[in-house]
Structures are given as structure tokens and as C-alpha cells.
């Protein structure tokens, strides 16, 4: 019979013993540079122009398109559990609403401005972030205004985006978050807010490091925002472009961004770390995007992972990389899970 063998060892060095530093659950929390809290969570809301809408999104488990009339019942239990912030995305479904310049984006009767006013009235404690983009509202599905050849008209695009951002702020948004990735839009938005006497009370949260890729499909299903032709690779960053991302971070910070979003998050932790160093005095926000969320759910449904465990692992990774805020479709679950952990 084989007998287990033990090699002779040297006496253990004092500096080699680490286990005593994390053998207790509280110690494991103390070892975390940042601990996930409810205040960090930002929950995306898809608000449709059908006020009574409540439609499940097949590719986004547990997420719905919601009309303004359904918001109160939907948000009330989440706010009671500690939800502090939402980010609004408008979904125009009425035929004929979309046009080449995204006129419906800041329509006073449209879903976003109606959503802002409703939430300000019924949930004044909620911090309202509005995504600023044109893709949901343009007939071509791109994020700006186009030239005749289908390329982005930068000047008209940033002028239009700035107008949308200012109108969201006028309606009561606490924060505007431009996600279009068109050069120079942060400067125009900031200038527009200054000229409207709104800059002192409107936070500009820039999607400075937003990458093109294959993780946005469920979102585009939810927002009905897929481009009708081409793709967005000429204005969203290439996945391998770390240097470009660093330049974009520096640019948006210099143009007046008050905070930075890195999107997607799981595959871009190096960019998140770069952002926390380049923009060290600004809050860094991770966006756990629809494709990442759907992947976790798919893996959990197959029994490959436990959803709660993998959700904490992924989101703690964002904090470790430098994020202080997280836009996440898992916010409702985390409101329960964090109570269980405590």
C-alpha cells in the first residue's frame, strides 16, 4: 500500500502566514477596499410611450418595459428596500415617432420627460439619471445626426445631444449621462447647462469609455434601438483600444465631466483601473450591461454558477478595479441579498 509522503520543510516565515487575516466573515469584509452597498446601485428603467405598458423582455430576465402609469407600483417596493438611484431610457413605440434627428428624445410628452416628472412627484428621494442618446429616437437607429452618406455629422449631433441634455435637466433630472460617444459632446452639454443656469445642480456622468461589441443585444431588444444599417464601430471604442480609451477619459474629464462610466465592465477591468487613476478625483461607474447580465442568468439556469454568488463576485470585481457606482440590472436582487448578508 502506498503511504503518503511528506517532505522536510523549513520553519514558516512570519510574513508567509496570511490566513489569520481573513478567517472570520467580518475580517473578510475588512479586507475589502470597498464593500458593496445599496447606495452604489443604479437601476435601469425602460420607460415606454404607452403609459400602461408592462412588457417582459425575453432576452433580459426579470426586466420590463414600463409605462408611466405602472411606475408607482413597480418602484414602491424597491424604494422601500433602499433603492436610491435609477437611470432612465425612453422607448418610443408609437409608429411614426422616430425621425432622422431624434425629435422625440426631448418631447415634453415623451417617456423620459414624463418619467422624470412622475418620479420627482412620487419618489422625491430617488436620484434620477437620464441616459442622453438619440439611437432610440432616430429612424436610422444611430446615436447622432447623419450626413447623406450615413456617417456621423459631429457638429449637428453634439448640438442636438446638448439640447436633449438641457431639456432633461430642465424637467428635473439630477444627472445627464451622454452615451453616444460622439467627439466633443461633453463640452457642448456642459456649456448648454451653464447657459441655462443648470450646471450648478446637474451632474454630467460621461460614458467616456464605452466600447463597441457583442454585449448590447438584449438592451437593443428592450429599447428598440438597433441600427437599421451598419454598426457603431466608428464612434464607440474598439475592444482592444486601451490607448484610445485613456485618451477619451482624459478628453471628457477636461471637457467638464463630473463622473465617468466604463461600459461594458467585466471584460474591461483594466480600463476601470485606468479610469480610477486618470480621473482619480471623479466617481467611476461600472455599467454591467445587458449581455453580461443575460450571461450570468444563462449560466445560473444551466447550473454552472449560483446567481447570487457570481453576482457578488463580478460586482466586487468592479469595486476592486476602482468603481464606486454600478449600473446594474441586478439591483432589485442586490437589495434583498445585501439585507441577507447583513
UniProtKB/Swiss-Prot annotation:
GO terms for molecular function: porphobilinogen synthase activity; zinc ion binding. Inhibited by divalent lead ions. The keyword Transcription regulation does not apply. It is an enzyme of class 4 (lyase). SUPFAM superfamilies: Aldolase. Pathway: Porphyrin-containing compound metabolism; protoporphyrin-IX biosynthesis; coproporphyrinogen-III from 5-aminolevulinate: step 1/4. Binds 1 zinc ion per monomer. GO terms for biological process: heme biosynthetic process; protoporphyrinogen IX biosynthetic process. InterPro entries: ALAD, ALAD_AS, Aldolase_TIM. 5-aminolevulinate 2 binds at residues 290, 329. Zn(2+) binds at residues 133, 135, 143. The modification Phosphoserine is found at residue 254. 5-aminolevulinate 1 binds at residues 220, 232. The active site is at residues 210, 263. GO terms for cellular component: cytoplasm; cytosol; nucleus. Its cofactor is Zn(2+). Disulfide bonds: none annotated. It catalyses: 2 5-aminolevulinate = porphobilinogen + 2 H2O + H(+). Keywords: Heme biosynthesis, Lyase, Metal-binding, Phosphoprotein, Porphyrin biosynthesis, Zinc. Belongs to the ALAD family. Homooctamer. Catalyzes an early step in the biosynthesis of tetrapyrroles. Binds two molecules of 5-aminolevulinate per subunit, each at a distinct site, and catalyzes their condensation to form porphobilinogen. Present with 11600 molecules/cell in log phase SD medium. This is Delta-aminolevulinic acid dehydratase. The lineage of its organism: Eukaryota, Fungi, Dikarya, Ascomycota, Saccharomycotina.
